[in-house]
Each structure stands twice: as structure tokens, then as C-alpha cells.
Amino acid sequence: MAARELILAFESSCDETSVAVVENGDTILSNIIATQIKSHQRFGGVVPEVASRHHVEQITLVTDAALKEAGVTYDDLTAVAVTYGPGLVGALLIGVTAAKTIAYAHHLPLIPVNHMAGHIYAARFVKPLAYPLLALAVSGGHTELVYMRSAGEFEIIGDTRDDAAGEAYDKVGRILGIPYPAGKEVDRLAHLGQDTFHFPRAMDKEDNLDFSFSGLKSAVINTVHHAHQLGQELSREDLAASFQAAVVDVLVHKTQKALHQYPVKQLIVAGGVAANQGLKEAMNETLAVNFPDVDVIVPPLRLTGDNGAMIGAAAHIEWAKQHLASESLNADPGLSFTHAS
């Protein structure tokens, strides 16, 4: 095995076309991201057909840019990696097809990567991981507590029963008049308001590690609709602060509960919602008091959203285990997180 392992990694599971070159699983040589946010904003969310069309238009350009920025050619590569699930089937297919084509044409191994494993392994760009560890993976499509005894070994110990946290942010943002994606603006407004509405903290009293955000989402929407019927104008800042407090309280509470049951050395907060300032502040402050020996790792802002570099980091683990894909690899939109490859 070469001392310098270079992996060309593809990510196209939703609305970002990203290709990266990652060295030895922890060094980013390039990480090109073509976002589609403006194309989806007028629809209030991601439209699968639009996403697929943009991936087709961007995938070759982004690949060329990633190789150029990294200063490498196909001959320098060790392997090609790609997200094959979970995600939007059409979007995934674009990345899978591109990766398979390049791997076949240049006689390179193909490494299949679970999208959510990628989010967790983005922490490898911050510092080496120490097992066992716990990950709180929070995004638009997932809210999961994952226990990892070792590299590549995933056990979901908590999951959402309905909406993911990121999905709730976008839907509440819409009712507050915030364009998609709403997370960053809801977070900003929340820091300007107060928790005056005291929305429900779902499942925080139940004896499990699962989440539920649909009731909270409905509570916010119903509060706003009721006020409009009465001709009242509610504070967007207070609504955002009250909603975010309810989300963050539950995420922190369940994470602490998991840490009591699963002693670990590190906690990774991963996924798009990991960019939320309110969540980071609450998690760091609470764990510093109650779990001072647990090292909290949050990937930098540029690596919390979907990106190719995180797929390269995950692929390095899979490559070490020789978990490779054949040319029959297909997109798996409902891929289970318990199977990283």
C-alpha cells in the first residue's frame, strides 16, 4: 500500500455537487462544491428533478477543478470513492455513474461510502479519532445518535421517530418567511430573541434515546396561524428563539443521556445542523460541566454541509478494510446507516 494514498471522492446525494481529493484520509488537497441553493429557493426546498439536472451539468466541471486544485492527475490516484446512499436516487446516480466511469477508465478501485458516515468522519480533519466515540449526526434528513466501538463500526442508539431536526428548521423557517435553507437565519434570529413561548420538548422524559420534532414543528406553525387569525403579529426573534431552545434542549439532553449509558472519549457533532451556533454553544457549555473528560469535536463550518472531502475521509477507513465495490454498484437512497459500505 502506497505511503501517500490519494482518493478522488464524489458527493451528490442532495443539492451539492462536490468532488474532493483527500490524502491519507485527513488532509484535504481540494474540495470543490457547486451549490444549487438559489435554484431550489423559489420552491421552498429541494426539487429532485432540478437537483439531478444540476448534478449532470456540474459533475465534470467540478471533477476537473478538484484535480487541478490538488495538482494531481488520474495516474496519481489510489482509488475513487462515492456516496451511494442515503439520499435522492437521481442525484446519487449522477455521482455513482461518474465515479464508476472514472474508476473503470483508469483501472482504479471503487470505494462505496455511506453519506452519513461521511458526515461523522469529517471530524478526522480536526483531529485523530479516539474510540469508542459517540456521534450526534444532525442534518436535514437525519437525527441520530451513533455509537462507534471502532473505526467503521456503527450502532444507532437513538433515531428520530418523524422529522429530522434540519427538516423542522426549514419548515419552521418557511412559516417565519425565511427562504430555504432556513437554518442559518433561524439561528441568527434566535440569538436576538427570548424563549417566551416554551414550546414542547418532545420525548425528553421518555426512557430512550430517540427524537421527535414533528410535534414541535406543528406547535410553532399553529401558534403563528392562531396569532394571524386574531390579527396579532408575533416576534419572529422570540419564535425562533423558542423553537431553537426546544430543539437544542432535546439534542443536548439526549446526548447527555447517551453519554451516561455509553462512556466514550469523544463526542462528534456532525451534519448540517452542526453549524448551528446555538447548538454548539449549548453542547460545549453543558458537557464542559457534566462531562469534562469528553472531547467535543465539531467539524469546521465548510465541512458540516455536504462535501466531497468528508466522503474521502470515510473512504480512507473503508479502503483500509478493503471494502470495495464492483462495477454493479448502484444508488441506494434508503441505505441503512448501520451499513457504512
Curated annotation (Swiss-Prot):
Cofactor binding notes: Binds 1 Fe(2+) ion per subunit.
Enzyme type, top EC level: transferase
Pfam family, one: TsaD
Tagged with keyword Mitochondrion: no
Binding site for substrate: 137-141, 170, 183, 187, 276
CC cofactor: Fe(2+)
Example of a GO cellular component annotation carried by this entry: cytoplasm
GO biological process: one example: tRNA threonylcarbamoyladenosine modification
Matching HAMAP family: TsaD (MF_01445)
UniProt name for this protein: tRNA N6-adenosine threonylcarbamoyltransferase
Lineage: Bacteria, Bacillati, Bacillota, Bacilli, Lactobacillales
Primary gene name: tsaD
